[in-house]
């Protein structure tokens, strides 16, 4: 009999212990939830003020008003910014796009200088000195492929006849070439051929010759400046000049 009573009492005591443990766990969990929901409050007596960012439920010391910025619970959504990765990626893409556009528009492109021929030739004869004076207006075509204005800072030209320099022309601050455009630049050189080339005078004044063509060689150099860079283009061209037409005698 005694053994049967003790065996029956043992399961009931175990069951009661399990129920007590379960009730204890539930009580601890309820206490933790209550603490988590309870707002932060600093009880410092009269030396405290209401924390505005805590919706009036928390307090901070008066002397730390300028030091403490905010008291935000861990569950506040402000601590979990939305779409942060998307915003960062978008910012990076925008920066790359802006950098690419800046490089594309500011990257120096070529400025092409081409010869556009001789427009006007005025011939003057000096019979006394057997001298031929050629006043030649030549034209250059300058093409600007950049997205900004370029400046033609200087232009120099030499006219040669039979490998001898007979004229030199130099000028500065020539012209400004607008973006993505081309412009014609005219310059005038004066060549005098006499002395060892006095035979040119007789050749150009012989009436029996219908066409009085002579060949001159022109070496032209152009300096161009843009966004802190300086480039130089050179041209070497040969031209036929009729020294018998459009002439005057002095």
UniProtKB/Swiss-Prot annotation:
Annotated localization: Endoplasmic reticulum membrane; Membrane
Organism phylogeny: Eukaryota, Metazoa, Chordata, Craniata, Vertebrata
Keyword Lipoprotein: yes
GO CC, any one term: endoplasmic reticulum membrane
Residues annotated as transmembrane: 87-107, 197-217
Organism listed in the record: Homo sapiens
Comp. bias regions, Basic and acidic residues: 16-25
Family statement drawn from the similarity comment of this UniProt entry: Belongs to the TMEM106 family.
Keywords, ordered alphabetically: Endoplasmic reticulum, Glycoprotein, Lipoprotein, Membrane, Myristate, Transmembrane, Transmembrane helix
Protein name per the record: Transmembrane protein 106C
Membrane topology category: Multi-pass membrane protein; Lipid-anchor
Subunit structure, interactors included: Interacts with TMEM106B.
Gene: TMEM106C
UniProt key word Kinase: no
Pfam family, one: TMEM106_N
Lipidation (N-myristoyl glycine): 2
Glycosylation sites: 173, 186
Record region (Disordered): 1-25
